[in-house]
From Swiss-Prot:
Pfam families: CobS (PF02654). Pathway: Cofactor biosynthesis; adenosylcobalamin biosynthesis; adenosylcobalamin from cob(II)yrinate a,c-diamide: step 7/7. One of its GO terms (cellular component) is plasma membrane. The lineage of its organism: Bacteria, Bacillati, Actinomycetota, Actinomycetes, Mycobacteriales. Joins adenosylcobinamide-GDP and alpha-ribazole to generate adenosylcobalamin (Ado-cobalamin). Also synthesizes adenosylcobalamin 5'-phosphate from adenosylcobinamide-GDP and alpha-ribazole 5'-phosphate. PANTHER family: ADENOSYLCOBINAMIDE-GDP RIBAZOLETRANSFERASE (PTHR34148:SF1). Its main location: membrane. This is Adenosylcobinamide-GDP ribazoletransferase. Belongs to the CobS family. It is found in: Cell membrane. It comes from the Bacteria. It comes from Mycobacterium marinum (strain ATCC BAA-535 / M). GO terms for molecular function: adenosylcobinamide-GDP ribazoletransferase activity; cobalamin 5'-phosphate synthase activity.
Amino acid sequence: MIRSLATALSFGTVIPVPASVAAPMGRGAMTALPVVGVVLGGLAAGVTWSASLVFGPVSPLPGLLAVAVLLLATRGLHIDAVADTADGLGCYGPPQRALAVMRDGSTGPFGVAAVVLVIAVQGSAFSTLSAAGSRGIAGIAVAVFAGRVTAVLGCRRSVPAAAGSSLGSRVAGTQPISVLVAWLAVLLFASLAAAPRPWQGPAAVVAAVCAGTLLIRHCVRRFGGITGDVLGCAIELATTVTAVVLAALVRL
């Protein structure tokens, strides 16, 4: 378990992990990925809270700074996946052509638009949550955590890997139902602290998980399976949906 967690931290963050401890990304590391979400969620919540003390609760800067720190802490891994997946979904042709577009180093108009939207919406939602007090700050951490749980769900036993995907072939179909149920239960429990009313947090994370699952299902149909980019895009989508829904609900 320690080796799997070290691998997940090495893959999903800039935290230095000795090569002798980490291993190639696989089933165990994917199971441990939500723990990385806890670390990054705490970081994002801390940055947003600290920045709100400096710039005030109504400024958009706290949330945008938190998103910037997350991009640095993850080496931009998932936001790059958003761009690649958007370009792949936006092109015409068979799955092989779409996958080739995703592997291309350049970013097209769909990718640029998707990245701008994710950063702007996610940052704005984080800022709105920071103005809602301690519950809102907790909601930021829960949103980041929800993204990683969604990635685990995307690797459930029935999901195949896309042809030629290195990461997809190592993690697709590796997660048993027991792991999925366990992480979903933890996420739902954690979400109770993310909003004033007990139903609001669970409603937000359920909406996010459903959105991420629908994206993954569509990508399986379009690409023939999942890739690392698809999982990264699902992480960002679920994080953003959780934050947006919570930002709307905390005002009720």
